[in-house]
């Protein structure tokens, strides 16, 4: 077994709490499938037979009840009261980890050729290989956000070599001063560094086993994304003398605080790179000289996805966009599944757009039009209803003559006759009165947070 796959499904979706207050983030429906289905399906498509899923008890119950995949999940629950980051979660399952690991977030939806990342990891004997994509901004409005001050996303500064594959620098702008400081040892080997600020971390990482060993002893690191990866990137091209000094101090360090141990303390001597002459020539051709590979034991690489679908569903806007994009992806991933479930009862199928999904046991009345939308299971949509660019979750009722545009309607909500809803988020179990006109509102229960 070359890799053990781990899916992180712990985060509560702090940036989309109006949705996740009633539905755990890994179970949010995207294209009528739970969000966590997408990384699990990605693993299954490339031949993984087992996966470790780190999650909560609520998600575990749902997965055990509804899991219909060939992939065998080993579900590990974290304590309910625990506030665990991704690095903490890896430590929690450390006894199960025997090989290099492939870590994915539960909110990743992508059609990436996974071998592109894995091949980098193998070819360069990397400590880390990760997936990034070019940032994409949706032009569609986000439900309930008109007039609100848009949160300014802090950018990552990413530096790569001339091949675009070796990851030489990575830092969030919040952690930077007015100047970028680059280590001289990096500039000696890579005098030209290409910087980009429009890349987004997809939360897909290949990690050497010794990196996980290092994490186990360095409990101050809580996040893979914001702490471990910048640390590994900084540790590249450490001079031989500094490595030797580290080795000389290793015994003393062990006697003191284990958390202070350097990554080089965990790299096995028998893990040093040994390549056949052909491989050495091949790597030299790829502009990573044999000398560089053999001397620099910590190596970080990145595959930057330029085409295809790659989205992390971390905000309400990205959640809406994922539901708009996913019908095309599902037609490839699940060609045997109909866009309209066979059990759905549709009065006028020609009024259902080819870019829409209709779930099981849903009823759609006479002269009702559904375009560019995802409709869940057991919904009731009466006559002369218009639904455009929307997501309706399960068991939603829309009465006669209503119009809904650009909105999310959560489970068991009711929209009474003649209502007009535009760019709204309607929470679980909410009722919109007849002939109401609602625009750019967030309508949730008193027990649900009002933050998006």
Curated annotation (Swiss-Prot):
Pfam families recorded: LbH_EIF2B, NTP_transferase
InterPro entries linked: eIF2B_gamma, NTP_transferase_dom, Nucleotide-diphossugar_trans
Biological function: Acts as a component of the translation initiation factor 2B (eIF2B) complex, which catalyzes the exchange of GDP for GTP on the eukaryotic initiation factor 2 (eIF2) complex gamma subunit. Its guanine nucleotide exchange factor activity is repressed when bound to eIF2 complex phosphorylated on the alpha subunit, thereby limiting the amount of methionyl-initiator methionine tRNA available to the ribosome and consequently global translation is repressed.
Record keywords: Acetylation, Cytoplasm, Initiation factor, Phosphoprotein, Protein biosynthesis
Domain of life: Eukaryota
Tissue: Brain, heart, liver, muscle and testis.
Protein location: Cytoplasm, Cytosol
Residues recorded with modification Phosphoserine: 260
Activity regulation, short description: Activated by the chemical integrated stress response (ISR) inhibitor ISRIB which stimulates guanine nucleotide exchange factor activity for both phosphorylated and unphosphorylated eIF2.
Entry GO CC: cytoplasm; cytosol; eukaryotic translation initiation factor 2B complex; guanyl-nucleotide exchange factor complex
Recorded GO MF terms: guanyl-nucleotide exchange factor activity; translation initiation factor activity
Biological processes per GO annotation: cytoplasmic translational initiation; hippocampus development; oligodendrocyte development; response to glucose; response to heat; response to peptide hormone; T cell receptor signaling pathway; translation
Predominant location: cytoplasm
Record lineage: Eukaryota, Metazoa, Chordata, Craniata, Vertebrata
Family designation: Belongs to the eIF-2B gamma/epsilon subunits family.
Modified residues (N-acetylmethionine): 1
Record protein name field: Translation initiation factor eIF2B subunit gamma
SUBUNIT field: Component of the translation initiation factor 2B (eIF2B) complex which is a heterodecamer of two sets of five different subunits: alpha, beta, gamma, delta and epsilon. Subunits alpha, beta and delta comprise a regulatory subcomplex and subunits epsilon and gamma comprise a catalytic subcomplex. Within the complex, the hexameric regulatory complex resides at the center, with the two heterodimeric catalytic subcomplexes bound on opposite sides.
